[in-house]
């Protein structure tokens, strides 16, 4: 290693090499306001029952009175058989689950031995070891291609036929797209009149509108990328490249008006959808996400939409509040010097847990977390700074209220670090916290009427439905590090970039018998957990239904599973050292390398559409970049406008002002004026001004996942 390489290696461990290392972004007043909001609900007002009875009068308890049940009356099931059989049935099922868990561990051990001594032997084993030694994607790609050549996977790429996509349609469409694109380019090059060019361009646009759709003809089926270590079918790659060229031809066509181009790209964007990076929870296992993000960033495939839950929310906040240049300097082992949430000793933890029921101090975590969020930055401010859309999943402390996905649309003025804390507030580890909102004067105030929130992983670790609702996301890239889920990850037919080597990719991991037993045991475990939940037999430690940490969906179209080691469980609530973080960065990058080509092909079309959409959008200047543009003007949400209109300081003084406002505001104002006298309306506005201000903060909150769709499902049935 020469001197420049040694210097670079030393820099990545030097804390002074990362930007803003010594800077404290948060204002002490913000922490003080947060502490007041936390303690506000804990104080009891001193109220006497009457003038003759003292405050807090001691009353002897009636020993014969029945104890109040932990659950409310509506939750507690009744019936003789339920009361008698509940606990025996619960113990029997838990005993059977324990037996299944032991059998599952033996099955996985058998599969590991089978793959080690049967599947991986000889030269392919040495090639695989060489593959996993690579820390750079280009070198990894060369090693992957060498392994594909040895296994004969290159011949598989050259054969168009495959059961998991419609190769006949794709082959025919590639020829049509190429012919239409060539005709348009030839006519534009020869200077043909617009009457001749426009019909050819319309034909090309019609072809694009018919094929630019999510997973059209199965070209985005993960199975197409699960038969080789690098790449996919040559026909699929040719189709993706041709679609990108056709989109660029339409975008550069001077005979088509900008308005028509905008509507065309808007249509393509709606049909094709968006890509999002979803970072799971998992305590300190979440630091593997840093490596995943670094691999995507270095290869130019980091999505603009990012969501995080629990520990993943901290990583997502760092990514969404920094530019690409800042991230390249931050995602290094030296970042471990800024991760100081668990620096206290064991004695402090035990004393705090005994006093408060939580292992960590909320204010300390808020101070440390604020550095990753650039102080009291809001979701809207982060979007305006970097162009990335941050989403954080939070669960209300009330077990029956729906979850929330906080982002710049649903809660634009919510402070990011408060949402990250709420998403990481696991019962027993961190007490539920209050979300904070930034007011116009820069001070902080409680959000959502002071309700408290806790760990989002308990119910919505990967909020796919909410992402689809808000941002049309239909291609989630999930980085999954939850330790209780990683233990059960097993792809019997291979995964993206990791094919089954047994019988040249057409076999089963561990043989058919091993894969069949593994699938049966895993499905049986899932079945009994669902039985316990639906029969309401599970107890609720710490007032929380814990069944969802097993039964929710934890995967996406692409799921990245960083490989953990046993020592990670020992350090699950400890700050990483630079050496441990360096290993986690390396493992995270290596786990993402097999997915890079699949993500590149997806974003190749998506970015071409977005580029044309932003270039010809009437609301955005063509010179503005998506990452560097801000939002000028007022929000266009009709609900926000209606609530703003009802505030006393926003009322129009004359008809001209009323006509300048949106049509929705005019209709609401005119309707209200017909229903109420003017004096009553003024009195009502004065008395409810504070309520409308709070409602305005909460106006765009949309709730997430199963609770959102439960009512619709009932209506359909």
From Swiss-Prot:
| GO cellular component labels | lipid droplet; membrane
Q: What is its EC number?
A: 3.1.1.-
Q: From start to end residue, where is composition biased (Low complexity)?
A: 660-673
List all membrane-crossing ranges: 87-107
Q: Where is the active site?
A: 310 (nucleophile), 455 (proton acceptor)
Chain positions covered by the region annotation Disordered: 620-696
The record places the motif (GXSXG) at 308-312
> What does the record list as coiled-coil region(s)?
none
Q: What is this protein called?
A: Patatin-like phospholipase domain-containing protein AO090003000839
Q: What is the originating organism of this protein?
A: Aspergillus oryzae (strain ATCC 42149 / RIB 40)
């Amino acid at each position: 290693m020469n001197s420049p390489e040694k210097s670079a290696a030393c820099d990545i461990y030097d804390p002074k090499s990362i930007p803003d290392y010594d800077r404290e972004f948060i204002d002490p007043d913000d922490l003080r306001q947060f502490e007041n909001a936390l303690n506000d609900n804990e104080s009891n007002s001193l109220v006497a029952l009457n003038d003759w009875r003292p405050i807090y009068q001691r009353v002897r308890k009636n020993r014969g009175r029945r104890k109040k049940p932990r659950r409310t009356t509506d939750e507690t099931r009744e019936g003789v058989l339920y009361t008698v059989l509940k606990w025996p049935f619960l113990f029997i099922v838990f005993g059977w689950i324990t037996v299944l868990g032991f059998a599952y561990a033996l099955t996985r051990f058998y599969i590991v031995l089978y793959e080690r001594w049967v599947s991986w032997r000889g030269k392919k084993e040495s090639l695989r070891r060489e593959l996993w030694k690579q820390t750079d994607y280009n070198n990894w790609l060369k090693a992957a291609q060498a392994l594909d050549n040895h296994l004969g996977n290159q011949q598989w790429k050259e054969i168009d036929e495959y059961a998991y996509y419609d190769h006949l349609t794709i082959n025919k469409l590639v020829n049509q797209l190429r012919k239409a694109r060539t005709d348009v380019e030839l006519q534009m090059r020869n200077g043909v009149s617009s009457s001749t060019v426009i019909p050819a361009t319309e034909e090309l646009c019609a072809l694009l509108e018919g094929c630019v759709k999510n997973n059209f003809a199965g070209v985005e089926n993960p199975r197409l990328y699960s038969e080789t270590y690098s790449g996919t079918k040559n026909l699929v790659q040719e189709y993706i490249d041709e679609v990108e060229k056709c989109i660029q031809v339409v975008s550069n066509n001077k005979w088509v008006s900008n308005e028509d181009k905008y509507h065309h790209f808007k249509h393509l964007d709606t049909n094709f959808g968006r890509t999002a990076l979803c970072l799971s929870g998992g305590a300190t296992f979440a630091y593997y996400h840093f490596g995943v993000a670094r691999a995507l960033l270095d290869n130019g495939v980091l999505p603009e939409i990012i969501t995080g839950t629990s520990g993943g929310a901290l990583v997502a906040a760092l990514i969404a509040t920094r530019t690409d240049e800042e991230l390249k300097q931050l995602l290094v082992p030296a970042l471990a010097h800024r991760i100081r949430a668990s620096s206290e000793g064991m004695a402090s933890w035990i004393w705090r847990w005994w006093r408060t029921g939580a292992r960590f101090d909320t204010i300390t975590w808020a101070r440390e977390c604020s550095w990753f969020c650039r102080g009291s930055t809001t979701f809207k401010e982060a979007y305006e700074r970097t162009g990335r859309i941050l989403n954080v999943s939070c669960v209300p402390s009330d077990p029956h209220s729906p979850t929330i996905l906080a982002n710049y649309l649903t809660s634009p003025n919510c402070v990011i670090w408060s949402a990250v804390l709420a998403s990481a507030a696991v019962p027993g580890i961190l007490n539920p916290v209050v979300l904070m909102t930034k007011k116009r004067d820069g001070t902080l105030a409680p959000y959502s009427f002071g309700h408290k929130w806790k760990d989002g992983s308990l119910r919505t670790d990967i909020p796919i439905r909410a992402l689809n609702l808000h941002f049309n996301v239909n291609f989630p890239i999930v980085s999954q590090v939850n330790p209780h889920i990683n233990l059960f990850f097993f792809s019997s037919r291979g995964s993206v970039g990791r094919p089954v080597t047994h019988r040249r990719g057409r076999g089963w991991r561990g043989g058919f018998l091993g894969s069949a037993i593994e699938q049966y045991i895993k499905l049986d475990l899932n079945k009994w957990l669902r039985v316990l939940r639906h029969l309401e037999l599970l107890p609720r430690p710490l007032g929380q239904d814990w069944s969802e940490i097993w039964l929710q969906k934890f995967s996406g179209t692409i799921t990245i599973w960083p490989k953990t080691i046993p020592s990670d469980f020992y350090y699950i609530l400890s700050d990483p050292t630079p050496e441990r973080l360096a290993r986690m960065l390396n493992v995270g990058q290596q786990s993402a390398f097999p997915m890079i080509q699949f993500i590149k092909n997806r974003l190749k079309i998506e970015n071409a559409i977005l580029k044309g959409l932003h270039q010809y959008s009437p609301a955005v200047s063509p010179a503005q970049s998506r990452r560097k543009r801000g939002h000028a003007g007022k929000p266009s949400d009709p609900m926000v406008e209606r609530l703003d209109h009802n505030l006393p300081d926003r009322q129009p003084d004359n008809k001209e002002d009323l006509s300048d406002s949106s049509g929705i505001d005019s209709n609401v104002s005119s309707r209200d004026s017909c229903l109420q006298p003017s004096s009553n309306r003024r009195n009502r506005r004065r008395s409810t001004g504070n309520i409308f201000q709070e409602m305005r903060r909460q106006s765009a909150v949309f709730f997430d996942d199963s609770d959102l769709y439960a009512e619709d499902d009932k209506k359909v049935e």
